[in-house]
């Protein structure tokens, strides 16, 4: 479970780094926060979780 904070930190870094470069995605975020948020904006999160072994349980 020690790697979970690292994964969260990396995700925050990626989000902060990608936000300025992805204007269209940032504009769509307010509309997605209700239900589409988990489907639209978190596939990379699941990928990193699986890659690190923190979420998938592999």
UniProtKB/Swiss-Prot annotation:
Protein family per UniProt: Belongs to the conotoxin T superfamily.
Residue ranges spanning the membrane: these are: none
Which tissues is this protein detected in according to the database?
A: Expressed by the venom duct.
Print the organism lineage: Eukaryota, Metazoa, Spiralia, Lophotrochozoa, Mollusca
- Name-wise, this protein is Conotoxin Im5.4
Q: Which residues form the signal peptide?
A: 1-18
Any one GO molecular function term: toxin activity
Domain notes from UniProt: The cysteine framework is V (CC-CC).
